[in-house]
């Protein structure tokens, strides 16, 4: 962490550093502890990990949907990227996933876009707390691999979702392993709750990444964040919103 723009660099700049953890929380800590700003990140994941974020793609900016709600804006593995964006750690972000993946297969509380009908009330209410963000969402079919200078943030369920067969998992592993690229750094989260139960596949993938980048993985300890509790008023609001969002999603309305 020798430079605030480069949180996972070491004494040999040409060498790719590989971090491995059970969840994505330790990556947020790396960025925070390193004083990182304006990073470019390629995030390969079945889920967005941006719960609570509203992205205005047309104007290149983002803000929290719930501007000051401590419960909805809590940090965890489902929102760490939202906080990384809002704190200025990340200003260029690409979210890459399989065709079976992304918002259509995520839970109700995933990232919102400016074109979403469900985002309209929050846009009407306004808000001055926008931060700059260049954002693109892509499937593997349109992805050409990490770009020079990008950090690769990879959630194992982006390659090995729990419903996938091993053949499909190996096809997606090749999207990473068979490409020629040298990322600024690599972070892999296991995300056992959502990934394929065969641990040997994950371990094999890490071993092959070590070989690909001629490095040894740095295993980071687990990290948990205080979750807090929702207020009574938020619980009442949530009951109504959950019902409305679920009905909209069934009709493919965002």
Annotate each language-model stretch with its function.
Residues 38-59:
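Short, solvent-exposed beta-strand-terminating loops
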